[in-house]
C-alpha cells in the first residue's frame, strides 16, 4: 500500500466551495484503478492540553475558525505507480479550483505502510 496525507489550510469564506470540491475529487479518485480509500477530514476538535489527554477527557469542539479552516486528505492506493497515474489527471482537472480556496500550498506526506 502507498499513502498520501495532505494537509490543507482553506480560506474561511471558501468552506462550502472546498467541501464540494472534495466530494468531486473523492468521487473521481474512487473511479481510478489502484485507488483503495479516499477520505477528507475537517478539523473540528482539539485537545485542551496533555494533562486532559492523560486524564481521558474528551477533545473540545472548535467553536470558531480564525483565519483558516484545516482539512486533511487520507488517500490509499496500491503502489507508487497508481499514485502517479492518479496525480496527473487529478491536478489537470482540479488544480485551479483548489488554489482559489487555499491560503497556502498544502503539506503533503507520502509513504508506505509499516503496520
Predicted feature descriptions by range:
Residues 3-9, 72-74:
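Active-site-flanking beta-strand signature of metal-NTP-handling nucleotidyl enzymes
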Residues 22-25, 29:
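Hydrophobic alpha-helical core bundles mediating ligand binding, dimerization, or RNAP-core interactions
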Residues 16-19, 78-89:
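Short amphipathic alpha-helices within nucleic acid-binding modules
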Residues 1-2, 65-68:
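Short, flexible turn/loop "capping" segments at secondary-structure junctions
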Residues 22, 86-87, 95-98:
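Short, flexible helix/strand-to-coil boundary loops that buttress conserved ligand/catalytic motifs
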Residues 36-66, 93-115:
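Glycine-rich beta-strand-turn "strand-cap" elements at beta-sheet edges
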Residues 31-34:
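Glycine-centered tight turns that cap/initiate beta-strands
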